[in-house]
Amino acid sequence: MLLQKEREEIVAYGKKMISSGLTKGTGGNISIFNREQGLVAISPSGLEYYETKPEDVVILNLDGEVIEGERKPSSELDMHLIYYRKREDINALVHTHSPYAKTIASLGWELPAVSYLIAFAGPNVRCAPYETFGTKQLADAAFEGMIDRRAVLLANHGLIAGANNIKMAFTVAEEIEFCAQIYYQTKSIGEPKLLPEDEMENLAKKFEGYGQQ
């Protein structure tokens, strides 16, 4: 099979997305771009994560043509492909329906610098305007909202996070969900004190090289 490693990672991180509470049921999707081969591996549409096997993962090119796989690719394929076409620093994407991120997104709010951990994504996390799922309009809105970030909230929908590898993309999604929870909790008590913009710009640069290489 093509992209065996990427297929196995998508299966593993799909299960982790469920166990970490970042989505429910078949919601959300994951993809990995093998830039050397010019091929994308993406989770199949409507299949339970704990039932998904490596052979269920769909392999496509950047034109969205299926190269290998019998399953239908995720309905959010366009939203994944736009990043791989336009962002050379992104090779993996995790789209979640995590509860706190979705709560903030359903208010149409951006996620401000309530914690230094926001810097995993950038100085803040914008909220892209609502568009119907699975459409080019949603893909365009998501890309614009995340054009210089590593995550964006999707109004009344969820979150998408990206990075140069699947481990970091998942980490960004987890950390932003945690920050959304902190923001929700602080807003329920009072008004959170936000970190200054210059500090967040500095932290965002530090997080670019975060973790083991």
Swiss-Prot record:
Species name: Bacillus thuringiensis serovar kurstaki (strain ATCC 35866 / NRRL B-4488 / HD73)
GO CC annotation terms, alphabetical: cytosol
Any Pfam family the entry gives: Aldolase_II
Residues that bind Mn(2+): 76, 95, 97, 157
GO terms of biological process kind: carbohydrate metabolic process; pentose catabolic process; toxic metabolite repair
Annotated function: Catalyzes the cleavage of 5-deoxy-D-ribulose 1-phosphate to yield dihydroxyacetone phosphate (DHAP) and acetaldehyde, as part of a 5-deoxyribose salvage pathway that recycles this toxic radical SAM enzyme by-product to mainstream metabolites. Is also able to catalyze the reverse reaction, using several aldehydes as substrate, with acetaldehyde being the preferred substrate.
Reactions catalysed, as given in the entry: 5-deoxy-D-ribulose 1-phosphate = dihydroxyacetone phosphate + acetaldehyde
Cofactor note: Binds 1 Mn(2+) ion per subunit. To a much lesser extent, can also use Co(2+) and Mg(2+) as cofactor, but not Zn(2+).
Cofactor: Mn(2+)
EC number(s) stated in the UniProt entry for this protein: 4.1.2.-
InterPro entries, per the entry: Aldolase_class_II_sugar_metab, Aldolase_II/adducin_N, Aldolase_II/adducin_N_sf
Subunit relationships: Forms homooligomers, possibly homotetramers.
Keyword Metal-binding: yes
Reported phenotype of the disruption mutant: Cells lacking this gene show no impaired growth on minimal medium but addition of 5-deoxyribose inhibits growth at a higher level than wild-type.
Active site (record annotation): 76
Protein name per UniProt: 5-deoxy-D-ribulose 1-phosphate aldolase
Chain positions recorded as substrate binding sites: 28-29, 45-46, 74-76
GO MF entry, a single one: manganese ion binding
Record family assignment: Belongs to the aldolase class II family.
Pathway stated in the Swiss-Prot or TrEMBL entry: Carbohydrate degradation
Entries under NCBIfam families matching the protein: PRK06833.1 (NF005302)
Keywords carried by this UniProt record: Lyase, Manganese, Metal-binding
